[in-house]
């Protein structure tokens, strides 16, 4: 394997989701199979090295430098996990090393400092956990050693004086072999996870392939070369993705804050470039939000001058609300304050109008305060977890008895909107539309029901408007910036929020276009998933093919 061959391989699998990580693993696989560098018949075989290891271990025990321990047997040939070159040997993973027993100097986690004289190394993912200033706890390192995390399986090569952090650490000092190859082999070794259980026994029972000493050095040099190339490939990929992200963001930004003179050209460019601009799930998410933002700015469908203006809708909704009050189905409420020019987030097209939510819907209502319980009987109670991506999704709700005094008043009806008034700052204000059957389900008190007019508004347009970033940034976030902990945006605040309201006929056209474009986003997302799966299968097939030659003489073809 050389750099040119690796580059050729990378070109075939570059767009697979984990291509670089898999290539790194592939390099290690080649290394421990004797397929990364050619063998040299002049090298002293590994069997001679094993004799020196056994002799050195005996000397250390006799000198009292290490304690005698029960050693795992050298692996018989029948236990070989795969074929290795003739001069290599399989050995138990801990055989060519001895464990350092002087670990009573470890520092407790609570005593680890953010800065200090001596680095603290533990079994966590961070290479250096922190620092310690106590020289009595320092382990002096004259030659590199290996730290193995008994709980985490993390393996670290340490070539500096350090302090051991907390429990679960095993230190291995290699004997008569190249420490960096030993580290490479342990890093490659696949150990089953026992969660936070102990793994050192698994390590002792596992086998690693041991090449001649001279070949160990050649292998490590080649691994260093190819890993450095992987670093460059990874940096180039990140740079490429960052540029693609900036292009995608810039293209969508031009649509979100449109220039009337260039909007048509910007929109055409974005639509034509969609496959190039949407290469990751977050791109699709941004595209979906751009579609919603265009919808509420009057940029998604053309206006029709024959449409009845939105101001007439508000008059009809007000009359419908008055009729409900007269029939005593809802209470009369004070009129909302007129909208001042400075309140409007942006200018709408002439046939549209800005309106307060309380003037657009017939009424708002808090949910049930009755305690709900898991049950197969009764009325399901929807909670904030049921609001997902603009929809109200039913799943495993708790229930209240159907004899509750709050029913039937709090039954949901199809096309009701549910607004989450209490949640974390990131989630408060999320809204979904209820599309299930009438009078079968209710909702919890930290949700607010909005009942739209079904004759003078399109509830799905209202739901779209309340799920835009524009609505969140201008109507919700200003209300929660000064809050700490759980955020709350109550019903009074909700009724006073502003949304842009188009004519009813245009609302219907907008909803149809949003549905069409969201279906396109669904297809793009599915295409991404399919492409990723295809690239992953190609990656698997390519790496399997590259690892398949069993005859060492075939190595040069890799």
What name fits each language-model region?
Residues 74-79, 94-143, 154, 159-168, ...:
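Sequence-specific dsDNA recognition surfaces
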Residues 3, 22-26, 30, 35-36, ...:
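Non-catalytic DNA-recognition/assembly elements of restriction-modification systems
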Residues 163-170, 194-213, 440-448, 459-460, ...:
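A short glycine-rich beta-alpha junction/loop motif
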Residues 19, 85, 113, 140, ...:
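Secondary-structure capping and boundary motifs in well-ordered enzyme cores
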Residues 88, 206, 216, 352, ...:
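Structural signal for hydrophobic
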Residues 11-17, 21-72, 77-79, 254, ...:
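Extended, domain-scale alpha-helical bundle/helix-rich regions
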């Amino acid at each position: 394997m050389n750099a040119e061959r690796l580059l050729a391989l990378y070109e075939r699998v570059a767009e697979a989701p984990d291509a670089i990580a898999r290539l790194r693993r592939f390099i290690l696989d080649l290394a421990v199979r004797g397929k990364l560098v050619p063998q040299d018949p002049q090298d002293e075989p590994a069997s001679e090295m094993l004799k020196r290891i056994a002799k050195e271990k005996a000397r250390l025990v006799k000198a009292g430098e290490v304690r005698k321990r029960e050693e795992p047997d050298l692996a018989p040939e029948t236990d070989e996990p795969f074929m290795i070159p003739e001069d290599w040997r399989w050995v138990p993973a801990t055989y060519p090393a001895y464990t350092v027993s002087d670990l009573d100097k470890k520092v407790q986690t609570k005593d680890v400092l953010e800065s200090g004289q001596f680095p603290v190394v533990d079994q966590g993912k961070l290479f250096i956990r922190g620092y310690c200033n106590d020289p009595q706890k320092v382990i002096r390192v004259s030659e590199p050693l290996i730290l193995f995390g008994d709980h985490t399986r993390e393996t670290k090569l340490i070539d500096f004086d350090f302090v051991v952090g907390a429990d679960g650490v095993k230190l291995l000092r290699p004997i008569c072999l190249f420490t960096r190859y030993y580290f490479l082999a342990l890093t490659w070794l696949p150990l089953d996870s026992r969660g936070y259980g102990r793994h050192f026994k698994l390590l002792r029972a596992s086998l690693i392939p041991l090449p001649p000493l001279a070949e160990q050095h050649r292998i490590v040099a080649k691994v260093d070369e190819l890993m450095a190339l992987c670093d460059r490939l990874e940096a180039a990929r990140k740079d490429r993705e960052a540029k693609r992200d900036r292009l995608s963001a810039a293209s969508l930004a031009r649509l979100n804050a449109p220039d009337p003179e260039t909007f048509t050209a910007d929109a055409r460019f974005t639509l034509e470039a969609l496959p190039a601009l949407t290469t990751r799930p977050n791109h699709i998410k941004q595209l979906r939000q751009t579609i919603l933002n265009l919808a509420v700015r009057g940029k998604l469908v053309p206006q029709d001058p024959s449409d009845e203006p939105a101001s007439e809708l508000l008059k009809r909704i007000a009359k419908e609300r008055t009729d409900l009050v007269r029939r005593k189905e809802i209470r009369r409420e004070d009129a909302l304050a007129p909208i001042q020019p400075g309140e409007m987030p942006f200018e709408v097209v002439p046939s549209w109008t800005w309106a307060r939510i309380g003037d657009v819907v017939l009424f708002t209502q808090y949910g049930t305060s009755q305690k709900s319980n898991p049950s197969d009987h009764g009325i399901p109670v929807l909670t904030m977890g049921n609001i997902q991506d603009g929809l109200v999704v039913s799943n495993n709700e708790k229930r209240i008895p159907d004899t509750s005094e709050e029913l039937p008043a709090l039954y949901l009806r199809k096309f009701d909107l549910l607004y989450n008034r209490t949640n974390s700052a990131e989630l408060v204000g999320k809204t979904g539309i209820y599309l299930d059957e009438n009078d079968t389900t209710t909702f919890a008190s930290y949700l607010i029901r909005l009942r739209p007019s079904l004759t003078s508004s399109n509830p799905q347009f209202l739901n779209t408007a309340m799920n835009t970033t524009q609505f969140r940034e201008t109507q919700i976030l200003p209300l929660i910036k000064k809050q700490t902990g759980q955020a709350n945006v109550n019903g009074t605040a909700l009724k006073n929020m502003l949304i842009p309201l188009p004519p009813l006929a245009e609302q219907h056209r907008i909803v149809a276009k949003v549905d069409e474009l969201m279906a396109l986003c669904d297809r793009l997302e599915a295409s991404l998933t399919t492409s990723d799966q295809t690239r992953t299968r190609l990656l698997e097939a390519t790496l399997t093919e590259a690892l398949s030659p069993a005859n060492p003489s075939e190595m040069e073809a890799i």
